[in-house]
């Protein structure tokens, strides 16, 4: 590993990408401590046990409870991306047309997503500031008024726009997917505080139950290790489909008559479904705070509270649904079958074309079922465990956080590895 890290530093291009990414993350962390004007941030400390805001605060690296200019984080962008991707499924013909236009279409969709993020972010900023102030008994906003609320909403929206730009810069000039890296950094930044809370609760206040608390912490560590191993296994696992190439096929990637494999990941969607599910389940509750307490908003708060049995089921269902959705965004069976046919390749015992497409689709459905159930279980189990063990509420999203942190780390390592392999260096993973 140390040799691999040394290789990173030797290659100027990779070294510059890593340094650029780190500098952007430093900017992100600094922005998390710049407060929004006209806000008494001390009031928010009383709200840190509320799960809806706790999960947003974790993803933002503490920016929410600081009510900083980056308080909303990147969630409005993720929500906008979900909606735009769903609308591409023959809901909005123009979006569907753009999605089939290659790079040009992707640029148009990306630009529209940016605009939609600004609109969505502004609405969410108004709802969040108004709702937070109501929950704090009017003590959060020091100078309440239409002008103040508009100013706060503009500042928060600008913060989200800045993070969106920052993520794009990391993607273009740094390492990994910029948006995922920002979420990764936010989660990692909050780990010391969570550890400190667990230590204070389990050891400092343990009294004559210290031994029992030690056993509990050991169980927690074993559970974390099991989750880490499980996530790595699922993220790396592939199903190899045997592919044969006809003799005399000039376009095949291997000599005619030989066989190769088409690898399909057990979880081709990665951690994106979890991020999407978090954005989807927190947005309604955040917006509901704008309308105060009534039967409808109380129902929304209950339904989308992932610590409540109903909300837990909704959260798991969202993860499963988004895993299927994004798996077929990442893997296109029709395109795969078409490419194999053009290259003279076929699955033994299966006709090229439609039958090959159906076989790949069937395999992908089964693989995604395993991957989606795994993601849902890992995200939900820690919530149950925390409630049973009486751990701090900040640990409730431990499974979700681990999924994202490990998933993003693996994807980033793969990208760095590919950069090293191109330059004839050996990477992290053995081949």
From Swiss-Prot:
It is found in: Cell membrane. GO terms for cellular component: plasma membrane. Pfam families: SecY. The chain crosses the membrane at residues 18-38, 64-84, 116-136, 146-166, 175-195, 214-234, 262-282, 309-329, 369-389, 390-410. Keywords: Cell membrane, Membrane, Protein transport, Translocation, Transmembrane, Transmembrane helix, Transport. One of its GO terms (biological process) is protein transport by the Sec complex. PROSITE patterns: SECY_1, SECY_2. InterPro entries: SecY, SecY/SEC61-alpha, SecY_CS, SecY_dom_sf. The keyword Repressor does not apply. It is a multi-pass membrane protein. The keyword Cell inner membrane does not apply. Belongs to the SecY/SEC61-alpha family. NCBIfam families: 3a0501s007. Component of the Sec protein translocase complex. Heterotrimer consisting of SecY, SecE and SecG subunits. The heterotrimers can form oligomers, although 1 heterotrimer is thought to be able to translocate proteins. Interacts with the ribosome. Interacts with SecDF, and other proteins may be involved. Interacts with SecA. The central subunit of the protein translocation channel SecYEG. Consists of two halves formed by TMs 1-5 and 6-10. These two domains form a lateral gate at the front which open onto the bilayer between TMs 2 and 7, and are clamped together by SecE at the back. The channel is closed by both a pore ring composed of hydrophobic SecY resides and a short helix (helix 2A) on the extracellular side of the membrane which forms a plug. The plug probably moves laterally to allow the channel to open. The ring and the pore may move independently. This is Protein translocase subunit SecY. The gene is secY.
């Amino acid at each position: 590993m140390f040799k691999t890290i040394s290789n990173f530093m030797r290659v100027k291009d990779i070294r510059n990408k890593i340094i650029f990414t780190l500098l952007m993350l430093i900017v992100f962390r600094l922005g998390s401590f710049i407060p929004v004007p006209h806000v008494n941030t001390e009031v928010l400390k009383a709200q840190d046990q509320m799960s809806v805001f706790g999960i947003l605060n974790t993803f933002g690296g503490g920016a929410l409870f600081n009510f900083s200019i980056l308080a909303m984080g990147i969630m409005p962008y993720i929500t906008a991306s979900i909606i735009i991707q769903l609308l591409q499924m023959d809901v909005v013909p123009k979006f569907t047309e753009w999605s089939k236009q290659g790079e040009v279409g992707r640029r148009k969709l990306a630009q529209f997503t940016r605009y939609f993020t600004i609109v969505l972010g502004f609405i969410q900023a108004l709802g969040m500031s108004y709702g937070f102030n109501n929950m704090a008994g009017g003590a959060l906003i020091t100078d309440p008024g239409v002008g103040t609320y508009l100013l706060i909403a503009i500042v928060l929206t600008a913060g989200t726009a800045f993070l969106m730009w920052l993520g794009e810069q990391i993607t273009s000039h740094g390492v990994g997917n910029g948006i995922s890296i920002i979420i990764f950094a936010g989660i990692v930044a909050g780990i010391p505080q969570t550890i400190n809370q667990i230590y204070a609760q389990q050891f400092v206040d343990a009294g004559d139950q210290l031994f029992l608390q030690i056993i509990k912490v050991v169980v927690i560590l074993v559970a974390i290790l099991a989750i880490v191993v499980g996530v790595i296994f699922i993220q790396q696992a592939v199903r190899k489909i045997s592919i044969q190439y006809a003799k005399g096929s000039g376009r095949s990637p291997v000599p005619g008559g030989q066989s190769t494999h088409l690898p399909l990941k057990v979880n081709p969607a990665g951690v994106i479904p979890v991020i999407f599910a978090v954005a989807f389940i927190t947005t309604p509750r955040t917006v509901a705070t704008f309308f105060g307490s009534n039967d409808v908003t109380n129902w929304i708060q209950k339904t989308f509270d992932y610590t409540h049995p109903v909300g837990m089921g909704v959260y798991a269902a969202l993860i499963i649904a988004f895993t299927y959705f994004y798996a077929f965004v990442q893997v296109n069976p029709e395109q795969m079958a078409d490419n194999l046919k053009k290259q003279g390749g076929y699955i033994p015992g299966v006709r090229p074309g439609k039958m090959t497409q159906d076989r790949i689709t069937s395999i992908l459905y089964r693989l995604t079922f395993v991957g989606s159930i795994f993601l849902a279980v890992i995200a939900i189990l820690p919530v149950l465990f925390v409630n049973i063990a009486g751990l701090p509420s900040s640990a409730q999203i431990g499974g979700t956080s681990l999924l994202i942190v490990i998933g993003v780390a693996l994807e980033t390592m793969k990208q760095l590895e590919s950069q090293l392999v191109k330059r004839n260096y050996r990477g992290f993973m053995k081949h």
